């Protein structure tokens, strides 16, 4: 094997050249109206492929055409998640950790986001310094030692001792801002730019002293949103200048230049403009690992703007793209088992990966039976909810849809060419470091679909129920 070719891609090339013929295909399924949840529902044999007709519905995978690597797939541990987790019985805590982070028997989360001090998904606003302490002499993460840090450490342990972890701030402390509040937007006062930059470095050092390695940071959560919770506005030019004149140099001087800095961290709608302003400035771009984005641009109506992910990927191919937050808002217990919520996840994961994303991070991993706690009442869905009165855990369809990606597509995998012949099916495929090929196929229609599954020159026959998702694995 050419040592320059990743093992996963080399194995995939073998599949593309016809070596799948005679191999076994595992079909794992989650389907509405059935008990199937990440269930191995069938095994199929590959045979030599034949030319499909126009009337056939087919999925085509060409493993010889490889694209971006996978950083990971996971979710966020917020104060809310940690507070709900702490109320669970020990056996239920272990069940949740096992379900999320065990790569063999759970869904193998490999990416984790957390917050720099409070967000709306905290029981109250707080910071790590005393009011007015621009020198950061009072800096302490003692608040997080009660709930969040213990859960983070247990998640890392459950994941086998390593999980790629990054952190995001929702707002600078009130005294550093133009509106003198952590809430309702406002912007960073110029005279506190260096102090705020040093705040990130103090956070990283403090968390690492607690045993939580920080891989990277985003500069600002949702920098164009004035929210009734913790929020702070950065125009594109403001974020560019803060990065190149303050945060980047301060991180480098602190010996943290190897930590990744992620810009934007907001919706797909404005990401091309933000990329142009920051990535086309060489003094800023040198500090930026890439761009984070969210999925909430549909708040104004219209469809998800996946094409903007592709536009940034094509224009700045040296920059990395990462979905940093997604959640279904407007919690309603009657929709807890909604497959529409799950299909929103499936559609976004497939399209974000197909347009160049290297990782995908859901929002809260766990919330209570009201979609909280949230100190401003912004209650949302999570893949798992816990009843704070009974301790009962509810695993939603969204958990299993996320698992169809995270369980079978592992860090270091490379996306490979995949397409469907009809719009009734959506698909993406990855070749894993262990040589396995994982293809996700989703049917969001009201009818089951029989389809031909082609891998290179070989094919197998597969059926997918209505409102279902499958992961097809060739080992």
What is the meaning of each model-derived region?
Residues 1-7:
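Bacterial N-terminal signal peptides that target proteins for export
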Residues 180-184, 223-228:
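A short small-residue
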Residues 173-177, 225-227, 270:
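Short, well-ordered, mixed-charge alpha-helical segments that flank or form enzyme active sites
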Residues 23-40, 46, 51-61, 165-167, ...:
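Substrate-binding and catalytic surfaces of secreted/luminal carbohydrate-active proteins
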Residues 113-120, 168-172, 218-222, 265-268, ...:
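Short, solvent-exposed turn/loop segments enriched in Gly/Ser/Thr/Pro and often Arg
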Residues 8-19:
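Hydrophobic h-region of N-terminal signal peptides that target proteins for export
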Residues 35-214, 235, 241, 245:
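N-terminal catalytic cores of secreted or lumenal carbohydrate-active enzymes
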Residues 79-83, 224-226, 328-330:
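A short, flexible beta-alpha/helix-coil linker loop
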